[in-house]
Regions:
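Alpha/beta-hydrolase active-site loop
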Residues: 46-63
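The alpha/beta-hydrolase serine catalytic core
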Residues: 69, 90-196, 200-225
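Conserved alpha/beta-hydrolase
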Residues: 19-41
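Active-site loop->helix "elbow" adjoining a glycine-rich segment at hydrolase catalytic centers
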Residues: 74-77, 99
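Short beta-strand element of the alpha/beta-hydrolase
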Residues: 1-5
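Short glycine-enriched nucleophile-adjacent loop
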Residues: 77-88, 94
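The serine-hydrolase catalytic nucleophile loop
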Residues: 7-19, 177
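Alpha/beta-hydrolase fold nucleophile elbow
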Residues: 63-74
Length: 225
């Protein structure tokens, strides 16, 4: 099951490539769009980490059965971790692609200057530039404040499933140190971080996809055997 990133959708390069790969391996595969993303309805401004987590859990509960391998990209890595904690009996393995746990606090709020924080607190919304979209992205106070209910990197993360993290060392959006911090917080599980020296945030190049496919096949083989 593939979980996209913030402002991404189920028709991105990684999602569609992974769908094709899983077909060739006869792996069941599911991808979806969060509320306010892609083909799903809703105002993006009303979205929060909790709401998007609820979307993921609804998909797990209503549309899947048996053991699950979650593959989360960027914010999807955060959602995947939260889903694994909420459904430990279902999630048997997890792969994070440039995972971004706590990004609303560390990479949004933590990077705002005093004037920007004041504007967000007063207006409830801030327009942020994006390297991937022509228009500015609306960042809401609700996104930041609700995100604080789901922070993971402030304490131990007790997962029972194996975790594999892939992160580019040239990632300009989510520093690769985030995956190293995540590794330190994971307890009770086997976790591996693979750093890609020249990798960016998206990790959508052919060589990146090959690395992802290998990780998926290895994880799937473990809990299918």
């Amino acid at each position: 099951m593939f979980l996209p990133g913030f402002r991404s959708d189920m028709n991105g390069i990684k999602a569609t490539a992974l769908a094709g790969h899983c077909r060739t391996r006869n792996h069941p595969f599911l991808r979806f769009d969060y509320f306010g993303h892609g083909a799903s309805s809703g105002d993006f401004r009303a979205g929060t980490i909790g709401r998007w987590l609820d979307d993921a859990l609804a998909v797990i509960d209503r549309l899947t059965e048996g053991p699950l391998l979650l593959v989360g990209s960027s914010m999807g890595g955060w959602i995947a971790l939260l889903a694994a904690l909420a459904r430990p009996g279902r999630v048997k393995a997890l792969i994070g692609i440039a995972p971004a746990p706590d990004f609303t606090e560390d990479l949004i709020w933590g990077r705002l200057d005093a004037a920007q924080r004041s504007e967000l607190l007063e207006r409830g919304e801030l327009a942020a530039p994006s390297a991937y979209e022509a228009d500015f992205i609306p960042i809401t106070l609700g996104l930041v404040e609700e995100g604080r209910r789901h922070l993971l990197l402030r304490g131990p993360i007790r997962l029972s499933c194996p975790v594999r993290l892939l992160h580019g060392m040239e990632d300009p959006d989510v520093p690769y140190q985030t995956s190293l911090r995540l590794m330190e917080r994971l307890t009770g599980t086997e976790a591996v971080v693979e750093l890609i020296e020249d990798g960016d945030h998206r990790l959508s190049r052919p060589q990146d996809l090959t690395r992802l496919f290998a990780a998926v096949d290895a994880m799937a083989a473990r809990f299918r055997s």
